[in-house]
Amino acid sequence: MINRKPTRIELNMEDIEEYEQLKKEQTNSYKQQQQQQQPTTISTPKQYPLLNTTQPPKKTTAQIIGYDQ
């Protein structure tokens, strides 16, 4: 393998400010979407997951190697 010097990545204050601004915008849009969806989720009944009865119970490691009989 060729030995290379590590790549140097410089981070400017402008980059940090831009990141913080984008993060705020995304969190605000996410909160707005959640608030818009909230009334619809309250009116719908809860749906419970279906039980999967077609698969046999999983064996533990001890059962697989024959330690637990």
Swiss-Prot record:
The keyword Nuclease is assigned to this record: no
Give any Pfam family that matches.
ANAPC_CDC26
Annotated disulfide bonds:
none
Read off the InterPro entries from this record.
Answer: APC_suCDC26
Its localization reads:
Nucleus
Q: Does the keyword Acetylation apply?
A: no
Alphabetized PANTHER family for the sequence: ANAPHASE-PROMOTING COMPLEX SUBUNIT CDC26
Task: Give the protein's recorded name.
Answer: Anaphase-promoting complex subunit cdc26
Species lineage, top-down? Eukaryota, Amoebozoa, Evosea, Eumycetozoa, Dictyostelia
